[in-house]
Amino acid sequence: MMKTRKGHPVYPLTVAQKFHLFYQAFCPKKEVLNIGTSLTIDTEIDWEVLRASIYKAYERSEGMRIRFAKDKEGNCYQYIADKEEREIEFVDFTGKTEEEAADTMQEWTRVPFKFQDSPMNRIVMIRTPDGYNGVYFLGDHMTVDAQSLICFLKDIIELYCNAKYEGVPYPKDMASYLEQLKKDLAYEAGSRAQQRDREYF
């Protein structure tokens, strides 16, 4: 049984994560778990400030730093990396058609994530053919859902605006993924809350 990975405590997968892993094994296209989207605005962007805001958002979000690992028996675990040091790419679609830009981002979305000790999301800063600026985001559904995706992108925007414009407040702290994970695992292990739910339904 794995207890630590790269110096980090490890945790079991939740029921939902196990379910995603189960059906992915039977899908011919492993990118079935990928969620891709883009967020752009018709204004000039300070790319270095945006890049710094993305790194800061990663620092503030445990859920976006999830890594997975398997032990010798094939059991899967998760842990939280200390920080993200990956290069945040910039892609300029100026001179391309809208269709070409969309096709490129769809190709990005079709690439499944590596499972072992690998980041489970990707951010690319983009300029679209019509001059809009922003980010493309790709996440694995084992770690990202619609709500967490929106919260993460919102945090990037608020961090950027705080750094760039006077009078914009610093965003509130992000909720702890680990705290919620521990609650979920306790619930799944047969907590009183689970018993009440079973009796109710």
Q: Positions of the model-derived regions?
A:
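Short amphipathic alpha-helices and their capping loops
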Residues: 1-28, 51-98, 119, 154, ...
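Gly/Ser/Thr-rich phosphate-binding loops and adjoining beta-strand/alpha-helix segments
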Residues: 3-13, 17, 30-49, 99-103, ...
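Active-site-proximal acidic secondary-structure segment that organizes catalysis
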Residues: 5, 10-12, 16, 22, ...
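Short small-residue beta-strand/loop micro-motif enriched in glycine and branched aliphatics
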Residues: 32-34, 86-90, 145
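Generic detection of short hydrophobic beta-strand segments and adjacent strand-loop junctions
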Residues: 37-41, 91-93, 165
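A generic structural signal for alpha-helix starts
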Residues: 44-48, 96, 143-147
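Short catalytic/binding micro-motifs of nucleotide second-messenger systems
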Residues: 65, 109-115
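Short Pro/Gly-enriched beta-strand edge/turn motifs at strand-loop
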Residues: 103-109
